[in-house]
A protein has these predicted regions:
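RNase H-like, metal-dependent nuclease domains and their acidic two-metal-ion catalytic environment used
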Residues: 1-134, 140, 144, 157-166
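Short, surface-exposed amphipathic charged segments that create phosphate/polyanion-binding patches used
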Residues: 143-152
Length: 166
């Protein structure tokens, strides 16, 4: 955790506008968070921007269950609330399409286990999506690479408390 925290830097995120980036999407439903993380390569450093979503109606209950304050994170803009008590994929789709206008998203990898209509809709919207399994075979090398980049301080993140907790 301290190695990750050491990668926080003050960074002018507006300089990323219209830059090329790649995304990773993990779809939650009722018990999990949904997260889109965008990754930018800026002068050899990897800049992460997380967009984390939780159903608004169960944020308080989930705060008690998970021992973190989702309600405060919603209030402070660190995570986004979707309408209802399950993940609202139409809300998430709109956010991804809005981000596609701000950044040049090259592709979004997603967990094929929880693939849904959202993936089809985003592809119909013009997004490039690539399935990515979350098993040992597919996750081992990327996880080792991420760990090495964190230890080398080649990562920049915005100190999002939810991302730090995850």
């Amino acid at each position: 955790h301290e190695e990750w925290m050491a990668c926080h830097q003050d960074f002018d995120y507006s300089t990323l506008d219209n830059m090329q980036c790649w995304g990773g999407l993990d779809l939650g439903s009722t018990r999990d968070l949904t997260c889109l993380t965008l990754l930018f390569n800026v002068d050899g450093k990897f800049v992460f921007i997380p967009y984390i979503f939780i159903p608004e109606e169960n944020a308080k209950k989930r705060s008690a269950r998970d021992g973190v304050d989702y309600v405060a994170w919603l209030r402070d803009g660190h995570i986004f609330g979707t309408p209802g008590d399950v993940a609202d994929y139409s809300f998430i789709r709109k956010k991804i399409n809005d981000l596609s206008k701000k950044y040049r998203i090259q592709s979004i990898c997603y967990d094929r286990w929880n693939a849904s209509q959202l993936v089809i809709d985003l592809q119909n919207d013009g997004a490039t999506l690539d399935p990515f399994g979350q098993g040992f075979v597919s996750m081992s090398m990327p996880t080792k690479t991420l760990e090495a980049e964190i230890l080398s301080k080649n990562i920049i993140h915005n100190n999002n408390p939810c991302m730090n907790w995850c």
